[in-house]
């Protein structure tokens, strides 16, 4: 457990990433507008080995992050932009690249994933509600290569992402309107889309329904070895495991 004043952690962090290649733990701190990096074996009141923080970083509202350890880059979504830093960035340092501007359609980005093999970055968007997909090397005020949005998508707000590079598929957790108040089971879902999807496209497969026990799904991760998908639920305060193979076969709805 990493805890204590020297950690520079605040009361909440909504994401975490483990860099297996370099044995490091990366955590966003939205209240401090920072990204904190710890040694993989850090424990107790351990100070971060690096911290990206300061006015030159342009970091704000940074609930999530994504790590690309193929190209040694760290990707941070903010309210109206995507910031790309060197993985080893430290201190008050400017991003290597910024994807931002009216053409990007980015507004209150929530959830992010990077596929360094197929060179895409996917983020959840609040307005229009949906998923924006950019080329990994995009920079400046560029339009997304595709935008998944519309009533058929079922998207009210996206929260977490995972990618399947070999199949060029994107997994997204989707929270339904008002479920944190109503506590209704089965309205939110986990959807699967192709990278090539564009416009008002329904998910090709979904984990949805009362038997899923989902209320407010957040993070998602895929275990390729055991063909399982893991989903965290905020309201249920639970960690669910589903069959990835059955989902793709259309048996799990």
Model segments located where?
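Blade-level signature of beta-propeller repeat domains, shared across WD40, Kelch, NHL, RCC1
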Residues: 219-253
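Short loop/turn segments immediately following beta-strands, especially the blade-tip
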Residues: 38-45, 84-92, 133-142, 192-200, ...
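Beta-propeller fold detector
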Residues: 1-4, 46-54, 93-101, 142-150, ...
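A detector of repeated loop/turn-to-beta-strand junctions in beta-rich toroidal repeat architectures
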Residues: 32-34, 46, 81, 93, ...
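Short, conserved, GDST-rich strand-edge loop motifs in beta-rich repeat architectures
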Residues: 174-187, 242
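Short loop/turn segments immediately following the C-termini of beta-strands
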Residues: 30, 40, 79, 87, ...
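Beta-rich, blade/repeat-based domains predominating
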Residues: 5-21, 55-73, 102-118, 151-168, ...
